[in-house]
C-alpha cells in the first residue's frame, strides 16, 4: 500500500517537476551572461563490441527487459522467444502468426505486440476440423515474416512510454530490417539475400532485399529507400519423434501454405535536425481454408534541433487485416472477417540539469482506434435463417483508446529514479441485439453499447550503480487494460451472451532485482553479465468466460455444478450461454527470472531461466468455441545456449539445451466446474531437448548455417501448443506427442 501511494505521488510529481524543469532550463538558455553549455552525463557501454549487443543492451537496463537480435540459429520465432526469461508463445500451427506470452498472459490488451513500434490487433480465425463441432480456432497474433525481423525487445512489468498503454503486463516489439541492415557503411547500394531449407515440414523460404542511400539536401542530409520480398513454402504435415504424421493428430492438406511478404521503406533526412521514415508492410497467405491479407503503413518523424529541451517523435500508423473463408464453415456458410487500426503517438523528451542532478522528462499522447467487422452467410440463399447475431464467429465492435503519458528520469551520482504517470481513457462501442423473449437479461431490447474504462497508472523504478558487479533495482507499476471487442461482443447466444457491465483489468506489479557485470572474470578479455528479477503481480477484475443456462422463469443461472436436481429439471435445453465476466477473486502471479551471458571470445554461453506460478481462471469458450486458449506457463523452463568460435571466430559450433518442467493444457472435456483443477490437466513429462548448430562466416559477404533440431529425436508435446487441447487427443483417438521429431535445416546469406 505504501508503494502505491509513493508511486502515485511520484507520478504526479514527475509532471510537475518536469514542467518546472523546462521553465528553469528556458530561463538558463535566455541568460545571455551564461556562456557555458553543460550537457547531460554520457554513459559508455561496452555492448557495442559484443556479438550479442541486443541481449547486452537489455541486460544493462534496470528492470525486467530482454532483447534478441536476428541470430536465431535457424530456429523458429517460437524457439527464439521461448529462450528468453519470463517470455513464451502460444503455439497454433493453424494461425500463421506469432503470439507472445509474457508471464502467463497473452492477447490484445494484456501484452502489447508491436512491429516497429506499431501496436498489432490482428485476430486470427482458423477453420479447423479438429475443433469442437468444426468450430474455428481463434487467437490474437502478429502477422510478420520472420525473414524481416532484425531484433525483438521484450518489456515485462515496468512502464515504457506509449508501449505500455493498454498493456497489462508488458510488451513485445519486433523491429524489421532497415536500410542500414542492407547497405554497408560507406556504400550507396546494397543487396542482402537469405535462403533456408528444412526437412520434416519446415519447407523452404527465401528473402531478397535491395536498398540505396545517398547524400542529399545538405552535407549532413541523405535520402534512402529499400524493398524486401520474402516467400515461404511450408508443408502441410510433419512427423513427431515416433514417426507419426501430424495429419493423424492435428493437420490436414489445407495446412500447406505459401505465404509471401513485402516490405518497403523510404528514409528522408534533410539534415541532422529532421528524420522522416515512410514504411509499408504487406502479408498474403492462403491456408486452412482462408485467404489472409494484411496491409500496414507507418510514418515516423524525429525532430532533434540543437537543444536538449526538444527531442520530438511522431508515429502515425494505419493497418488492416482481412480474412475471407474459401469454404463454408459449420452452420455459417462462407464468411469474412475484417479488422483495421489507426493510431498516432506523439512525444517529446527534454533533458536538463540542476546542479549535479540530470533530468530527462518525457511527455506524450497516444490515440488508437481499432475496429472489427464480420460477414457470414455468404453464398447462401435469402431463406437462410441463421443470423450473424447468434454465432461466436469474429465478434465485431469499435474501440477508441486515448491516453497521455509522462516519465521523469532523475540521475544523481550512482542513483537513478524513473517516475511515470499515464492516463487511459477507453471506449468500446457496438451493437447488442435484443435478447430472446424467453430469457431475462438487461437490457432486454436492442441497444448500442458504449463501455468506458479510464484511470491513472503510476509507476516508479529506483536503481543504483553501486559497483559494476551489483546494480540493484526495485519497481512498482499499476497498469490497466480495457475489455476488447472479442470479450464484450461474444455472441454464441446473441445479445444474451454480451455483458454490458464488463470491467477492465487492473494489475499491480512489484519487482526487485539486480544487474551484474564482471569483466576479466576468468581470463583476460572475457566478460560476464547477469540479470536476476523477482516479480509479484496481482490482477483485479480478471476477464474470463463461464457457462450459463436458462433456468426457471427465464432466469440466467451459472452452470458451475451447484444446481439441484429440481433446478436442472427446469433448465431450458435450447440455451447454453457463454458470457465473459470478471473474476471476483484477484489473480496472483509471481516468480523468478534469470538471464546470464558469458563471453570469452573462443567460448560463450547464454542462460535463461524462469520459475513462476501463473495459475489463473480459464475460459470455457476456449475449449468449446475455440477462443483464446489458456496461457498458464510451465512451472519452470530453461534454455542454455553454449558453443565455441574457431578460425579467428569465423566458425561457430554450439548447442541449445531446452529444459521444461511440469506444464499444463486446457481440458477440452470440461464439465462447467468453476474450479481450475477441473479445467487444466497436466501434460506428459517433457524431455530435455537438444539442438545443434554451426555457421561459417566465409567473409563479410557470405555466410552458411546448419542446424539439427531435436537431435535425439525425442517424442513429446510442446507446452502451450493448441494441438494438445484438441478433442481427438483428449478422446484417445490420436497420439498426444505433437512436437516435431529430428529436423535438419540449412541456410545461407549473401550481402554485398
Regions found by a protein language model. Name each.
Residues 269-271, 317, 358-362, 366-368, ...:
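Structural signature of Gram-negative outer-membrane beta-barrels, strongest in the C-terminal barrel
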Residues 269-281, 293-438, 525-534, 591, ...:
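Face-selective signature of the C-terminal outer-membrane beta-barrel domain
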Amino acid at each position: 500500500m505504501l508503494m502505491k501511494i509513493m508511486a502515485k505521488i511520484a507520478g504526479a510529481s514527475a509532471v510537475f517537476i518536469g514542467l518546472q524543469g523546462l521553465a528553469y532550463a528556458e530561463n538558463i538558455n535566455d541568460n545571455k551572461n551564461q556562456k557555458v553549455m553543460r550537457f547531460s552525463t554520457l554513459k559508455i557501454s561496452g555492448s557495442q563490441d559484443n556479438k550479442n549487443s541486443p541481449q547486452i543492451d537489455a541486460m544493462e537496463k534496470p528492470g525486467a527487459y530482454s532483447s534478441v537480435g536476428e541470430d536465431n540459429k535457424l530456429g523458429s520465432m517460437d524457439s527464439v522467444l521461448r529462450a528468453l526469461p519470463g517470455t513464451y508463445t502460444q503455439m497454433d500451427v493453424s494461425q500463421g502468426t506469432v503470439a507472445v506470452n509474457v508471464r502467463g498472459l497473452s492477447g490484445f490488451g494484456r501484452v502489447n505486440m508491436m512491429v516497429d513500434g506499431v501496436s498489432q490487433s490482428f485476430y486470427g480465425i482458423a477453420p479447423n476440423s479438429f475443433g469442437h463441432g468444426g468450430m474455428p480456432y481463434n487467437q490474437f497474433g502478429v502477422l510478420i515474416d520472420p525473414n524481416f525481423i532484425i531484433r525483438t525487445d521484450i518489456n515485462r512489468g515496468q512502464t515504457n512510454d506509449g508501449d505500455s498503454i493498454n498493456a497489462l503486463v508488458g510488451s513485445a516489439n519486433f523491429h524489421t530490417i532497415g536500410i542500414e541492415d542492407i547497405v554497408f557503411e560507406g556504400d550507396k547500394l546494397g543487396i542482402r539475400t537469405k535462403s533456408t531449407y528444412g526437412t520434416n515440414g519446415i519447407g523452404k523460404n527465401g528473402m531478397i532485399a535491395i536498398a540505396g542511400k545517398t547524400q542529399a539536401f545538405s552535407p549532413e542530409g541523405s535520402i534512402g529507400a529499400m524493398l524486401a520480398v520474402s516467400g515461404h513454402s511450408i508443408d502441410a504435415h510433419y512427423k513427431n519423434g515416433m514417426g507419426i504424421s501430424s495429419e493423424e493428430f492435428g493437420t490436414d492438406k489445407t495446412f500447406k501454405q505459401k505465404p509471401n511478404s513485402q516490405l518497403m521503406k523510404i528514409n528522408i533526412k534533410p539534415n541532422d535536425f529532421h528524420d522522416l521514415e515512410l514504411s509499408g508492410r504487406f502479408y498474403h497467405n492462403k491456408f486452412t481454408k482462408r485467404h489472409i491479407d494484411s496491409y500496414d503503413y507507418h510514418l515516423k518523424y524525429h525532430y532533434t534541433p540543437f537543444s536538449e529541451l526538444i527531442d520530438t517523435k511522431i508515429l502515425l500508423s494505419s493497418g488492416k487485416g482481412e480474412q475471407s473463408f474459401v469454404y463454408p464453415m459449420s452452420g455459417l456458410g462462407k464468411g469474412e472477417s475484417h479488422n483495421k487500426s489507426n493510431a498516432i503517438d506523439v512525444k517529446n523528451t527534454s533533458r536538463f540539469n540542476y546542479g549535479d542532478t540530470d533530468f530527462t522528462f518525457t511527455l506524450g499522447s497516444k490515440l488508437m482506434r481499432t475496429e472489427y467487422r464480420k460477414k457470414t452467410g455468404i453464398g447462401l440463399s435469402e431463406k437462410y435463417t441463421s443470423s450473424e447475431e447468434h454465432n461466436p464467429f469474429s465478434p465485431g465492435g469499435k474501440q477508441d483508446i486515448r491516453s497521455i503519458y509522462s516519465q521523469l528520469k532523475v540521475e544523481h551520482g550512482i542513483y537513478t529514479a524513473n517516475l511515470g504517470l499515464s492516463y487511459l481513457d477507453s471506449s468500446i462501442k457496438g451493437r447488442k441485439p435484443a435478447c430472446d423473449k424467453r430469457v431475462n437479461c438487461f437490457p432486454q431490447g436492442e441497444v448500442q453499447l458504449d463501455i468506458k474504462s479510464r484511470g491513472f497508472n503510476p509507476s516508479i523504478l529506483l536503481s543504483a550503480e553501486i559497483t559494476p558487479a551489483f546494480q540493484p533495482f526495485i519497481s512498482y507499476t499499476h497498469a490497466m487494460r480495457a475489455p476488447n471487442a472479442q470479450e464484450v461482443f461474444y455472441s454464441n447466444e446473441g445479445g444474451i451472451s454480451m455483458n454490458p457491465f464488463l470491467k477492465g483489468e487492473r494489475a499491480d506489479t512489484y519487482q526487485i532485482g539486480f544487474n551484474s557485470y564482471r569483466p576479466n572474470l576468468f581470463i583476460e578479455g572475457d566478460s560476464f553479465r547477469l540479470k536476476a528479477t523477482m516479480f509479484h503481480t496481482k490482477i483485479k477484475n480478471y476477464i474470463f468466460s463461464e457457462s450459463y443456462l436458462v433456468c426457471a422463469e427465464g432466469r440466467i443461472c451459472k452452470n458451475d455444478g451447484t444446481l439441484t436436481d429440481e433446478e436442472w429439471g427446469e433448465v431450458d435445453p435450447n440455451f447454453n450461454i457463454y458470457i465473459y465476466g470478471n473474476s471476483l477473486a484477484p489473480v496472483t502471479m509471481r516468480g523468478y527470472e534469470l538471464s546470464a551471458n558469458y563471453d570469452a571470445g573462443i567460448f560463450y554461453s547464454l542462460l535463461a531461466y524462469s520459475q513462476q506460478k501463473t495459475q489463473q481462471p480459464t475460459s470455457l469458450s476456449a475449449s468449446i468455441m475455440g477462443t483464446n486458449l489458456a496461457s498458464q506457463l510451465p512451472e519452470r523452463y530453461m534454455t542454455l545456449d553454449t558453443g565455441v568460435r574457431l578460425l579467428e571466430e569465423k566458425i561457430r559450433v554450439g548447442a541449445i539445451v531446452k529444459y521444461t518442467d511440469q506444464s499444463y493444457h486446457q481440458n477440452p472435456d470440461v464439465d462447467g466446474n468453476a474450479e481450475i483443477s477441473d479445467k487444466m490437466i497436466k501434460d506428459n513429462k517433457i524431455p530435455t531437448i537438444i539442438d545443434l548448430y554451426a555457421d561459417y562466416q566465409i567473409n563479410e559477404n557470405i555466410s552458411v548455417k546448419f542446424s539439427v533440431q531435436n537431435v535425439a529425436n525425442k517424442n513429446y508435446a510442446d507446452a502451450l501448443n493448441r494441438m494438445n487441447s484438441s478433442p481427438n487427443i483428449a478422446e484417445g483417438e490420436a497420439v498426444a506427442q505433437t512436437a516435431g521429431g529430428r529436423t535438419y535445416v540449412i541456410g545461407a546469406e549473401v550481402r554485398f
